[in-house]
UniProtKB/Swiss-Prot annotation:
It holds the Pfam family UreF. Required for maturation of urease via the functional incorporation of the urease nickel metallocenter. Belongs to the UreF family. This is Urease accessory protein UreF.
Length: 228
């Protein structure tokens, strides 16, 4: 075990990392308003679906970006970044991934001083890169020596915790309920990592009509606790 790498992973996977994730519910708020999610069981199902969709789309791009960065192919990371952005069909998803991505890059370059992260932030500021959160995470953690599968674990954990943290504020669930759901979903992390490694960037799939419908409903909702 590399203790330094492990603690870096823990730091940047922390659900309270100041990148703005708390402002978004990843579709949960609309799902609750639409009566799709209404109890612990449906919350668990909703989160699992989000994890499956994330790993077959963003996860494959993260894996490909990490592999490209480890071989010095920085331009490929930019291409994978736009591949993610272009597959976000709704305004809410695009806003979430780019806002969080830029915040992560800004924070990480100040904290770590890594030249690769500084280069990435410059690409974002000059609009050469979209600066999506998944690829920014790949850049940051590759600069810190994390393996591609470790970055996928971080990405999947972030997806789950964005939804489950929002659930605490939106539903009558306890912290124990949330941890029980998370513990159960984490049993499949090896399968999620294997899925991310399948096919490469050309096999990204972003078909998630319910997510897009919920995002559209959220933008026009009369009351909202979370950002769009």
């Amino acid at each position: 075990m590399n203790a330094l790498r492990l603690i870096r992973i823990m730091q940047f996977a922390d659900s309270v990392l100041p990148v703005g994730a708390f402002s978004f519910s990843n579709g949960l708020e609309s799902a609750i308003q639409s009566k799709i999610v209404y109890d612990v069981a449906t919350l668990s199902d909703f989160t699992r679906t989000a994890l499956l969709q994330a790993v077959s789309s963003d996860g494959r791009a993260v894996m490909a970006a990490c592999q490209a960065l480890n071989s010095g192919q920085h331009d490929a990371a930019i291409s994978h970044d736009w591949a993610i952005f272009n597959r976000k069909l709704n305004e809410e998803s695009r806003t979430m991934v780019t806002r969080m991505g830029k915040k992560l890059a800004e924070m990480a370059v100040e904290v770590t001083g890594e030249s690769l992260i500084a280069w990435w932030l410059a690409q974002i500021k000059s609009d050469i890169a979209a600066g999506t959160y998944p690829i920014t995470l790949a850049v940051v953690m590759s600069a810190l020596g994390a393996a591609p599968r470790e970055v996928i674990v971080m990405h999947q954990y972030g997806v789950a915790m964005t939804i489950l943290s929002a659930a605490i504020r939106l539903m009558r669930v306890t912290h124990i309920d949330i941890q029980r759901i998370l513990f159960s979903l984490n049993q499949d992390i090896e399968l999620f990592c294997d899925e991310a490694e399948k096919g490469g960037i050309e096999q990204m799939t972003s078909y998630a009509p319910m997510t897009d419908v919920l995002a559209a409903l959220h933008v026009s909702a009369f009351t909202r606790l979370f950002s769009n």
